[in-house]
Each structure stands twice: as structure tokens, then as C-alpha cells.
Regions:
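Hydrophobic alpha-helical transmembrane signal-anchor segments
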Residues: 2-36
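Small/polar-residue-rich segments within soluble enzyme cores
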Residues: 31-32, 77, 81, 87-98, ...
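Short, small/polar residue-rich loop motifs at catalytic or cofactor-binding pockets
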Residues: 50-54, 179, 233-237, 421
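Short beta->alpha transition motifs characteristic of CBS
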Residues: 53, 68-74, 251-257
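Beta-lactam-recognizing serine transpeptidase/beta-lactamase-like catalytic domain environment
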Residues: 187-200, 237-275, 280-521, 528, ...
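Conserved, well-ordered alpha-helix/loop/beta-strand core segments that scaffold catalytic motifs
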Residues: 193-237
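Short, gly/Ser/Thr-rich active-site loops of penicillin-recognizing serine hydrolases
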Residues: 433-440, 530-592
Length: 594
């Protein structure tokens, strides 16, 4: 009897000991390691992930959306949380436009029924208060204006989602928000359920940017350029519209006749500006006092031989065969290469180089755009003393972008002060707080007010019956400007032409600088006066007719109308003189030589 009782007591003691150990372990886990094990369990059934932040939007100067981030939603249903299954099935199926039977079957078979959108806020509004129905927001980028201003605005990188080109890339840090963080629940297999259990940190949306671009002017510029490339059978071109009083870029268009998409060549591709650069040599001559209004050189009947070395020469020619003397003003008006080559010899190499550099050539403008070209301006020690000075005076042996050329002409229109061009007018936080507003940024004074006024007189004369830009004349407003025609340097040799025109409008108080550049027009004339100048006139007429542009029409209306100048003619020279008037419907082959 004693032995069985002893065994029972021993077993009871063992059981009590084991129970004690279990209780002790439980107490240890609960009291001393409970928090640690709870965290481990939490990690096993949950995961942390980032919450996407809304990317800031891009607008034109008047609030027209150019790039916006649209929120869309995904929807999930947790069957074990649903209280009224029939009602949930009915309302979810209707809102998401899915078969009710399919939803019912999935709710019986799956722990979490997930519908990947995109669904709009309107779609999910009826579901927001349903028990067991969860929504998850996400974002996608859209461009409401389609192709208009597309190279400027840019696009996102398809892989990273960050800015890939254009202003999307240049302003990426401003537009990108700060991601949030949330805890998501995992199922038994470790798969993440798409409904967040809780948010740890809310995402902060990115900033919004208002550009200097005027959507209406941009549309006019792009349509005009597209039509010109078609009508002139040209390879490509650029148009820049700039406010000379602020440096704000109002429109900037680039097109190529071949290839996919449009490259922003107005920022990236330098070209030899041709006769549009004659104004900068004139500016240096006037600023340094090397010429006055009476100083003149011979036109040499349109042909001048210039030494390029001790044994070599080159011949400079003019389309206009002027045999008499030409003043600086007249040389600009008729765009005489021969006269400007002679005038340039009154400047030293360093003086001419400095003049071009001061107008911004050879350096990036600093505009908010990736991969902007600095152009090409070789240092003075690489200039050939005589011929390079003559070449530079004619717009050769250095390269400029269309934006640089517009900025330089803007300095003349702005009383001689060069301003830094900009594409960004304003930046605001997601809650509307103003973070940045552009103010005109002077770079340097390039010429005095007096010299700037003199140059403006020269440019007004170019757009007259005596000048090379007769095709840019408007009926009621005066336009100032300078034409350009230059051989194109392609693949190591000169082939084809670049036609250009730099305009200031209105001439008495410029509100706009317009630079038009056409690459290798092959149908009709290739001269800037016969291609780019009439295109500028066409654009100005459309801008004046448009509503809601940056043009101050009240100021224009207060100005005294300027009629087209029709010269007095006499029978002996009637045909020659009348053919030089800028008739609205000129024959395409009637060109202005320059």
C-alpha cells in the first residue's frame, strides 16, 4: 500500500513541479518578456510601408494646369468585418461596376477581396462609411494640355517616378512631397493585405509651381512654328517669346521635322546667329565711342577681300550691292556684311569678345532647365585678328541658343540692362503658402540708356520700307527687329541656311521680345526677312487678337497708330519701289535680300 501511495505522491509532485515551471515561464513571458514577444508577434503579422505623397502640380502663369497629380483609389473588402453582407455586395458591385455574384463568391473564398483601380473619388464616395470596406489612395501624373509646352514641362521617369526631363526634372526637389508611413496587416502566408491598419506618419504633398509661360502665347508659337516648318519644308526651328521688363519666358517652342517627339533645342542647340548679331558689334562701337552718326565706310559694291593670314584671303559679299558709303545705321538697315566687317576693325579682339560675353553669349543663362547649353564663344587668344572680328560682326564663329539671343535683345529693349531669364514665376506650398515669387534679376548693364535708345532706332529702321524686315510690318503698330541669314555648319561643313528674326514689340515701349529661328528652309526663300519676319508678323496678329494674354492691350490702344509707310513713287522707278512695300499678300518668291 505504501509503495503505490508513494508513487502517486511522486507523480503529483512532478505534475505540480511541471505546472509550476509552466506558470513560472508564463509569468516570465507575461511580466518580463511580454512586451518583447508582443512586438515580435506584431512584426510577424504586420509590415511597415511608405505612403506615397502627392507630387506638386505645374501651372502656367494664369493657372492653366500643365502637369497635375490625380488621386485614384483601390478598394478592398474584409468579409470578417462586414455586418450586412447583402448590402455591402450590392453597393460595392454598383460602385465598382463588377458582377455582384463574383463579389459574393470571392467574399466566401478569400480573407480579403481586393480590387485594383483606378477608381475615382466619385466612384468610392458611396463606400466610405461601409463597415468592412477599405479604400487605398494612389497617384498618377497627367498632362491636361497634351503636347503643348510638353518639351518644356517634361515628363516623369517611367521607372523611378521622379522627374525625367524638362521642368519635371529641374524642379523635382520642389515638386516631390515627403512620404508618410503606415502599418499593414499580413495574412497567414505573410502576404500584405492592402488595407492599412494605422498610419504612423502622414504624407506631405509637394509644392506647386506657377510658370512664366502664357498658355495662349505658347499655343500661338507652337502652331506658327509647326505651320512654318510645313510651308517652308524646313528641318526644324525655335521660337522664344520673352518679357524684356522681367526676363520672364512667355513662350518657348521647338520643333523638328523628323524624329519622335520634340527636343527643347531653344535651350540646348547653339547656332551661328548671322546678321542678328550685327547689333552687338554696333553696340560695342557706340559704347566705346568709336563711331558717331556720321561715320561711314564704303559699300564696295557688295564685295570685300579680307586677309585671313599672311598668304590667304577670303571674300565677304553682300546681297545688296551698295557702292556708296554706309553709316552704321544704314549698315544695320540693309544688313551689309561688307560694311560691318569694316566697322569691326575699329574694335580690338578683346573689346569685341567682351561685348559678346557681356550680352550673355558663351555662358548659360541660368534658366531653370536641365542641360542648357552655354553656346560657343572662343577666348580672344583663339581669334584670328582680322577675319574673326569680321566674322563675329556678321554672326559667325560663335554659337548662341535661341534663348540667349532673346535675352540679349531683351537687354536692348530694357534700357541696356541684361536680365536673367526665368521659367518659374511662383512656388506655393500645398496649403497655399507663398514660398517664392520671381523678381526681375539684373545681370549687368551692357550699354547705357543712350546707346540702347540709338540701337532701338536702328532696329525700327530695319522694319521699314528700306530695311530687310519689311515683311514684319503691322498696320497699326510699329515693330523693331533684325533679320538674320547664316550658313549652317553641319557635320564639319557648311550646308543649308538658318533663317532668323529678332523682334521687339511694340517698338516705342517693348512688351515682347520674339526670336524666330528656322533651320534650313528649302521651299521658297531662305532669307530671314522672307521667312522668319513674316512668321513673326503672323504671330503678333494672332497675339493681338487673342484674349487673356500678357500683352497690355490698353497701353497699345493708347499709343498713336502707325500706318504702313508707302513711299512716294514716280513712273521711272515705280515697279522697283512698289515691289519693296510689305504688301499683305506677297508672292512667296518675292524675297527681301539681306
Amino acid at each position: 500500500m505504501a509503495r503505490p501511495a508513494l508513487r502517486i505522491s511522486f507523480l503529483q509532485a512532478c505534475l505540480l513541479g511541471a505546472l509550476g515551471l509552466v506558470l513560472a515561464r508564463a509569468a516570465q513571458l507575461q511580466l518580463f518578456q511580454g512586451e518583447q514577444w508582443a512586438r515580435k508577434a506584431e512584426r510577424q503579422r504586420t509590415t511597415r510601408d511608405t505612403l506615397e505623397a502627392r507630387r506638386g502640380s505645374i501651372y502656367d502663369r494664369r493657372g492653366t494646369p500643365l502637369a497635375v497629380t490625380q488621386e485614384f483609389y483601390h478598394v478592398g473588402v474584409a468579409p470578417n468585418e462586414v455586418q450586412d453582407r447583402r448590402e455591402v455586395v450590392r453597393r460595392v458591385a454598383r460602385a465598382l461596376r463588377v458582377p455582384a455574384g463574383e463579389l459574393e463568391r470571392r467574399m466566401r473564398a478569400e480573407r480579403y477581396v481586393y480590387y485594383h483601380g483606378p477608381f475615382t473619388a466619385t466612384d468610392i464616395e458611396p463606400l466610405r462609411k461601409l463597415k468592412g470596406v477599405h479604400t487605398e489612395g494612389s497617384y498618377r501624373r497627367s498632362y491636361p494640355t497634351q503636347s503643348i509646352a510638353a518639351p518644356v514641362v517634361g515628363r516623369l521617369d517611367a521607372d523611378s517616378g521622379s522627374g525625367g526631363s524638362g521642368l519635371e526634372r529641374a524642379l523635382d526637389d520642389l515638386l516631390t512631397g515627403r512620404p508618410g508611413e503606415a502599418v499593414f496587416i499580413r495574412d497567414r502566408r505573410g502576404r500584405r493585405l492592402e488595407s492599412p491598419a494605422r498610419r504612423i506618419r502622414e504624407p506631405v504633398p509637394g509644392n506647386d509651381a506657377w510658370l512664366t509661360i502664357d498658355f495662349t502665347l505658347q499655343d500661338i508659337a507652337e502652331r506658327a512654328l509647326e505651320g512654318a516648318l510645313r510651308d517652308l519644308d524646313a528641318e526644324g526651328g525655335d521660337i522664344v517669346v520673352l518679357d524684356p521688363r522681367s526676363g520672364e519666358v512667355l513662350a518657348i517652342a521647338s520643333r523638328q521635322a523628323t524624329g519622335v517627339g520634340a527636343r527643347p533645342t531653344a535651350f540646348t542647340d547653339p547656332f551661328e546667329p548671322g546678321s542678328t548679331a550685327k547689333l552687338f558689334t554696333a553696340a560695342a562701337l557706340l559704347r566705346l565711342g568709336r563711331v558717331d552718326s556720321t561715320a561711314a565706310v564704303s559699300g564696295h559694291c557688295g564685295k570685300l577681300v579680307v586677309a585671313t593670314s599672311a598668304r590667304a584671303t577670303r571674300t565677304i559679299t553682300d546681297t545688296h550691292k551698295e557702292c556708296g558709303d554706309l553709316t552704321l545705321s544704314e549698315a544695320i538697315t540693309v544688313s551689309s556684311n561688307v560694311a560691318m566687317a569694316q566697322f569691326s576693325q575699329q574694335l580690338t579682339v578683346t573689346e569685341q569678345f567682351t561685348a559678346l560675353r557681356d550680352f550673355g553669349f558663351g555662358s548659360p543663362t541660368g534658366v531653370e532647365f536641365p542641360s542648357e547649353s552655354r553656346g560657343a564663344l572662343k577666348p580672344p587668344e583663339q581669334w584670328q585678328a582680322t577675319y574673326t572680328r569680321a566674322s563675329a560682326a556678321m554672326g559667325y564663329e560663335f554659337g548662341v541658343t535661341a534663348l540667349q539671343l532673346a535675352s540679349a535683345y531683351g537687354a536692348i529693349a530694357n534700357d541696356g540692362v541684361l536680365l536673367a531669364p526665368t521659367l518659374v514665376r511662383e512656388v506655393r506650398a500645398h496649403d497655399g503658402r507663398l514660398l517664392y515669387r520671381h523678381q526681375p534679376e539684373p545681370v549687368r548693364r551692357v550699354v547705357s540708356s543712350r546707346v540702347a535708345a540709338t540701337l532701338m532706332r536702328y532696329l525700327r529702321q530695319v522694319v521699314s520700307t528700306e530695311g530687310t524686315a519689311r515683311g514684319a510690318q503691322l498696320a497699326n503698330y510699329e515693330v523693331a527687329g533684325k533679320t538674320g541669314t547664316a550658313r549652317r555648319f553641319v557635320d564639319g561643313r557648311y550646308q543649308g541656311y538658318t533663317a532668323s528674326f529678332a523682334a521687339l514689340f511694340p517698338a516705342d515701349d517693348p512688351q515682347l521680345v520674339i526670336v524666330v529661328k528656322i533651320n534650313n528652309p528649302t521651299k521658297g526663300s531662305y532669307y530671314g526677312g522672307a521667312t522668319a519676319a513674316p512668321l513673326t508678323k503672323q504671330m503678333l496678329e494672332r497675339m493681338l487678337a487673342a484674349r487673356n494674354t500678357t500683352l497690355d492691350l490698353r497701353r497699345l490702344q493708347e499709343a498713336e497708330p502707325v500706318p504702313l509707310a508707302i513711299p512716294e513713287v514716280r513712273p521711272p522707278d515705280a515697279v522697283a519701289r512698289v515691289s519693296r512695300v510689305a504688301w499683305p499678300y506677297r508672292d512667296r518668291d518675292t524675297t527681301a535680300a539681306e
